[in-house]
Structure formats: structure tokens, C-alpha cells
A protein has these predicted regions:
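Acyl-thioester-dependent acyl-group transfer interface
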Residues: 10-170
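Short amphipathic alpha-helical segments
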Residues: 1-5
Length: 171
């Protein structure tokens, strides 16, 4: 599904921006549930992202090529060592002696600037898949359909939620 969406974005860009050198990279945020890799008792959201990316300025991509990019990027980044390194980087910045004594309002402003430079704005869309949802048998007869809607971030306005229930996948 991620590859199909990336291909569609490339085709839209090709229509809207005929000059290849003016096209932008196509990057999708794919959330990864870290609870499956790292046991945690927290009830907070414990996730990171895998970010498959292609650059249309380098030429046209076939659907198979995009599928390979997504497949290999997922395999590379969705690894406990790689995710552990991302977590360690975040934790190390929190433990910095300078940042620990810095007033919160300054930290918040700095984090906003950093997030704007490297956060979700650097992607085209976020594709989040809850997977197959199972309901208790007593509840199932009362449910006709299951949907998953992602909140719209301030900078990256395109999101897609996917959920499967009762043999049907809703996008």
C-alpha cells in the first residue's frame, strides 16, 4: 500500500511539475509499534517511524522498483538495533547537562524549530496501519464497519489510516 501511494504521488508530481529537476522527493512515514521490539509497561504511545523515500528527480520508478525500496527500507530500519539507536539518540539529548538546566520555554521553542527542520514536514504523508482488529464476540454483531482516522498534523496535511476488521480492509 505504501508503494502504491508513493507511485501515485510520483504520477501526480509528474503531471503538475513537468520539469523533473523541480520535483521533490517522495517520502512516507510508516509508524512502527516499538512495544513488539522493546517490552514496556508505559501506556503512552511508544512508536517510531520507518521512512521509505524515492527521488523522482533521478528518473521514473516502476511500481516494482518502489516496492523494493519500501521492502528493503522496512527491513533495514525496522530492526531492534536501528530502532534502539534512534531511542538512544533521543535519550542522550534528554540527559545533556546543559539541556537539563535550560528553562522549559527555551527547550520547547528549540524543539519546535528542530521539528520543523527535520520532522514530519520532510515527508509527503503518513500511512498508519492498525492491522487486523478483533472484537469480543458479544460486541461484533453491533459493529457494521471499522474506520481509523489520523489527526491532521500542523505541517504535513496528508495522512492515511488503514484498519482491517471482519475480512475487510478500510483505507
Amino acid at each position: 500500500l505504501a508503494a502504491a501511494m508513493m507511485k501515485a504521488i510520483c504520477e501526480l508530481q509528474a503531471e503538475q511539475t513537468p520539469r523533473r529537476r523541480h520535483r521533490k522527493p517522495v517520502k512516507v512515514l510508516l509508524p512502527v509499534n516499538l512495544r513488539q521490539m522493546f517490552p514496556s509497561r508505559t501506556l503512552r504511545n511508544f512508536a517510531s517511524y520507518v521512512t521509505p523515500e524515492i527521488d523522482p528527480r533521478l528518473g521514473d520508478y516502476t511500481f516494482d522498483e518502489i516496492c523494493r525500496v519500501v521492502h528493503y527500507r522496512m527491513g533495514l530500519e525496522n530492526d531492534p538495533r536501528m530502532m534502539g539507536a534512534k531511542i538512544a539518540t533521543n535519550v542522550a539529548s534528554e540527559r545533556s547537562p546543559v539541556l537539563r538546566v535550560m528553562p522549559l520555554f527555551i527547550k520547547n521553542a528549540a524543539m519546535r524549530v528542530v521539528f520543523d527542520m527535520v520532522g514530519e514536514i520532510k515527508s509527503c504523508l503518513c500511512l498508519s496501519n492498525l492491522g487486523r482488529v478483533e472484537l469480543p464476540e458479544a460486541m461484533a454483531p453491533y459493529v457494521e464497519r471499522m474506520d481509523f482516522i489520523i489527526g491532521v498534523p500542523a505541517k504535513a496535511h496528508y495522512n492515511c489510516g488503514v484498519v482491517s476488521w471482519n475480512g475487510t480492509m478500510n483505507v
